[in-house]
A protein has these predicted regions:
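A domain-start/cap signature at the N-terminus of enzymes
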Residues: 4-196
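Active-site machinery of serine-nucleophile hydrolases
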Residues: 198, 202-226
Length: 226
């Protein structure tokens, strides 16, 4: 058991060092790059990577870290690998910054489209027209962008009394019928950029949604945690 614990701790230490190295390399390559066009967009996506890079997303930097010391690649190409890996996932690295950078704009437009109220058809049509003009808006890119982006909507802002150990009660409008309410139990370390296995549990006539959550996740302890 001690050997297994040591192995896990060593893995965490290695991941931490890789994350720190990725951040340092991003700063270094940003200083070396000579790109002036869309510089603000380049800075925005690099800032996002540095802010949200963690153990759950470090695998997206695999191509970038592997080729970061390749003297044959320019700083622009290395940043393209970092950006495309961040947006599309590990193994999807693109060395052309002119192809990788528009993916950031495409991703942001997709997020805006999903956030826009369904009754605002005009704005949604405008977003679709913008997407049609951008490189990287094809189905093969959109599928990967959506799979690796954060949820379009923020979780509901609840008081500490209403939010017990990651438990949320949400509802879905059902037209003329009353809203459909349901419960979601998130794990303590929940990260929206990590993929988790999901259990969809339907209660029967003799139980309640809360009882189903208790059965799968356990009951609360004194610290209001499961």
């Amino acid at each position: 058991l001690q050997l297994r614990v040591k192995e896990i701790l060593d893995q965490y230490a290695e991941l931490r060092m890789s994350g720190e190295r990725a951040t340092q390399l991003l700063d270094q390559h940003m200083q070396q790059v000579t790109v002036k066009e869309n510089r603000d967009q380049l800075e925005a996506v690099v800032d996002e990577i540095k802010l949200r890079l963690n153990w759950n997303t470090l695998d997206r930097m695999a191509d970038y870290l592997r080729l970061s010391d390749d003297a044959a690649l320019k700083p622009e190409q290395k940043l393209a690998l970092a950006i495309s890996g961040w947006l599309l996932g590990g193994g999807a690295g693109i060395e052309n910054l002119g192809t990788a950078l528009p993916l950031f704009q495409v991703r942001n437009l997709v997020l805006e489209y999903l956030k826009t109220d369904t009754v605002d058809l005009q704005r949604r049509r405008e977003i679709l027209e913008q997407l049609a003009q951008l490189e990287g808006s094809g189905p093969e890119f959109l599928a990967k962008l959506i799979a690796h982006m954060a949820p379009p909507l923020d979780p509901p802002q609840l008081s500490e009394e209403d939010t017990i150990g990651g438990l949320f009660q949400l509802s879905v409008p059902m037209g003329d019928a009353p809203p459909l309410k349901y419960l979601i139990q998130l794990p303590p370390e929940y990260d929206p950029l990590r993929r988790y296995p999901t259990v969809l549990s339907l209660h029967d006539a003799n139980t309640t949604p809360a009882m189903q959550i208790d059965w799968w996740a356990g009951i609360y302890n004194q610290d209001r945690k499961r």
